[in-house]
Amino acid sequence: MTAAALLQWALASVPEIIVVTGACVLLIVGELVRKGRDDLLLWASVAIVLLAAVATLMLAGEMRPAYAGMFISDRFAVFFKLVFYLATILTFFLSRKYAEIEGIGRSEYYVLLLFALVGMMIMASAIDLLSIYVGLELMVLCTYVLTGFLRKERRSNEAALKYVILGAVSTAIFLYGVSLIYGLTGTTQLDRMAEAVSGGPLDPALLLAVVFIVAGLVFKIGAVPFHMWVPDVYEGAPTTITAFMSVAPKAAGFAVILRVFLNPLVEASNAWIIVAAIAVATMALGSFVALVQDNFKRLLAYSSIAHAGFAIFGVVAGGQDGIASVMLYLLIYTFMNLGIFGAVIMMRNGDFSGEVIEDYAGFAKFHPGLALLMLLYLFSLAGIPPTAGFFAKFYVLVALVERGFVALAVIAVLLSVVSAYFYIRIVMVIYMREPERAFEPALTPLVSATLAFTAAGTIGIGLFPAWFLRLAQQSAFGG
């Protein structure tokens, strides 16, 4: 191996190297920082992510394969990495006051988030099943620990334990599928797997391998029938980690799914039939079960399941438009979901948690401006025009109709109507109920900035959806 080749590999992975190096340095520096200087850890973490973002943008102009065909830096990976950076920085901002209240603002909290970010970055650039596994495990190992970070709370420990056990099972299923693929094709690289379907019928064992890989991946995005961990983990984890897990790891899971599912091997296996069934079941379960939830975080967990189902419809559509619709959906979902979680986090003040929907009764009478922001996020999540959430769903539906999946588009619309009810129910509690007590949100400058930024993103994409769709199309394969 020549020095020039090593240099090319290093250049392709500069953003990952920056975050790993920064996280290691932060881990050491964190032990030297005096208690009460958490701001230093926060801004150092933000600086690391921003530096990685600059490096990523510098790589956006060309395609750089690396590590013997296991890793690539292309526009598709750049798009997803920018979504990860956005979600991570906003999570840092939301964590400042919340971490202080909960007593979790130690350096390892930020370091684990950074290493989870590295795992997601690897997943976005991975073009080999083994490198996908490495990124996947780095991400989930960090989120396992972060889920149980409230060590004195039983539900946090319970959530972490459930997540670890079910996550280990899903990983084993995924690895079994990978081993079958390697045994039957002699490779784990996605592009070389296509050679297995050239000429002749598809081996039934390959179909089984595809099913195992599909099962392992849909667990990571919380899709049916591997959704059972989502409600308990989202409810038990620290709210900032719940917010992070609801957007960033989900986007990373979809990045892998788009790379894997649109491979000729998977397309030849007619796996889209399985994926379509998963999409319908996921959206239906998330929408109907959310109707009876009283806990805000648990409701948002089922909301997350329903949104995952809708995004999977874009995977079923396939093609460049289908890919672009999923990418745009995930970008918009990052803004509106972090926004609504930011509203929940700002309610955490003293002995008031804001995790029960009834806690928001009459909120508009005390804080009309903040209530208006919550209204914006909830309407966007429901897909009500002219918010960004409407266009996220609209472009997925367009991709479905253009590919001839009209029945699936109709099902998606009907289930969206069902899901709109539980969002409007929260709006009614905020605006039409009498307040039970007076409360003051923990509205720090960083939380305020996060709410303002996510609101601007939700409104901005709603006003100029075509521009962001073109960005997603240019970032999609072959764009």
Curated annotation (Swiss-Prot):
Record-listed E.C. numbers: 7.1.1.-
Xref: Pfam families: Proton_antipo_M
Main subcellular localisation: membrane
InterPro entries per UniProt: NADH-Q_OxRdtase_suN/2, ND/Mrp_TM
GO molecular function list: NADH dehydrogenase (ubiquinone) activity; NADH:ubiquinone reductase (non-electrogenic) activity; quinone binding
Reactions performed catalytically: a quinone + NADH + 5 H(+)(in) = a quinol + NAD(+) + 4 H(+)(out)
Single GO BP term: ATP synthesis coupled electron transport
Keywords of this entry: Cell inner membrane, Cell membrane, Membrane, NAD, Plasmid, Quinone, Translocase, Transmembrane, Transmembrane helix, Transport, Ubiquinone
A GO cellular component annotation in the UniProt record: plasma membrane
Recorded topology in the membrane: Multi-pass membrane protein
Transmembrane portions of the chain: 9-29, 40-60, 75-95, 110-130, 131-151, 164-184, 206-226, 238-258, 272-292, 299-319, 326-346, 371-391, 404-424, 449-469
Disulfide bonding pattern of the chain: none
Keyword Isomerase: no
Subcellular location: Cell inner membrane
Quaternary structure annotation from Swiss-Prot or TrEMBL: NDH-1 is composed of 14 different subunits. Subunits NuoA, H, J, K, L, M, N constitute the membrane sector of the complex.
Family: Belongs to the complex I subunit 2 family.
PANTHER family named among the record's database cross-references: NADH DEHYDROGENASE
Protein name: NADH-quinone oxidoreductase subunit N 2
Organism encoding this protein: Rhizobium meliloti (strain 1021)
